[in-house]
Amino acid sequence: MFTLFLLIALSSAKVYFHETFENRDKWIDSTSSGKALGPFKIVSGKWYGDANNKGLQTSEDNKFYIAAAKLDEEFSNKDKNLIVQYNLKFEQGIDCGGGYIKLLPKKSIESEEKFTPESEYNIMFGPDVCGGSKRTHVIMNYKGKNNLIRKEIKCESDDISHLYTLIIRPNNTYVVKIDGVEKQEGKFDEDWDMLAPKEIDDPNVSKPADWVDEKEIDDPNDKKPEGWDDIPKTIVDPNAKKPEEWNDEDDGEWEAPTIENPEYKGEWKPKRIPNPAYKGEWVHPQIANPDYVYDPELYKYDSFAYIGIDVWQVKAGTIYDDILITDDIEEAEKEAKVILERNAAEKKMRDEIKEAEKQKEEEAKKEAEKQKEEETKEEIKKEENKEEL
């Protein structure tokens, strides 16, 4: 029976969207966002694993990039795996900008050009970098609310391509991979605040009035030293002298400046000691939440119809490529293997380019130093000739 079910599942496995960017015909820029959009370009990039492989690149700094494409067909992931996978390169050396994608239901927009940052989406997935923050977003919409994953998933921020994979299973579990390596996995009801909490504070219990939660107290045996408050904060500078040119009649009576008193110790405070009555931090007793109801279909969306890119980039140059949306894990893994091999070749080319640039810079530096040395010798020679004359 299981074998039959497996064969049926494999035979019905489908690819709903596969974009390798031979062109950008599927992608329509937003005309409804009200923002000044930067243009996308189809490029191979400065370094690549295959010169014939293209991607969709952001091309102008400090611009929004908002475009959408229609999936090959509308579908629901009910009772099926959902795999969202794509290759992304921050070729520009990202400092602040996103590289994520959004999956939208049919009801969200009438057509691709109607896509805006406010359009409702089912899932937002992918890297987002700004300053020290480098995270992979996995935002799930549930009953109209966008829920951020509670776990932190670091993203890659260098200038080579990385493959991002999100797997959602019909048992309410998920996996996030980067470059084929699992970075996070878990359960929907544990890693997102989609449902009401399973337990809540018992409303019939309050912290006892005599509960002591102060760890330390003032030492009752510590006394303020006599004369403590008599020490002034400032004193007359003993090294100050009235200027010889000072005239009391013209300048007024001279007053020596004051300085901070090295003997002054500030406000006296008694020493602190452990509180013998301390009971520890009071923990509110928990009870089962009567509003908690488990949803076995947290993973499920009735409609996937569009994919959108909606990012702001301070520094442009990000390249999207190899976007795959399918319910076939084997198909995604097969494609990932090819992409990762190509990414390895891309890294090799990038390293060779960087090494050549480094050598060129070093040679230019040596040439400049040599030139400066020759100029110095020439100056010395000129000075010597002047002295002889």
Swiss-Prot record:
Induction record: Up-regulated during the early stages (30 min-2 hours) of the development of amoebic liver abscess in the host followed by a rapid decrease to basal expression level.
Region (4 X approximate repeats): 183-248
InterPro entries, per database record: Calret/calnex (IPR001580), Calret/calnex_CS (IPR018124), Calreticulin (IPR009169), Calreticulin/calnexin_P_dom_sf (IPR009033), ConA-like_dom_sf (IPR013320)
A GO MF term: complement component C1q complex binding
Coiled coil: 329-388
Subunit structure: Interacts (via C-terminus) with host C1q.
Protein name: Calreticulin
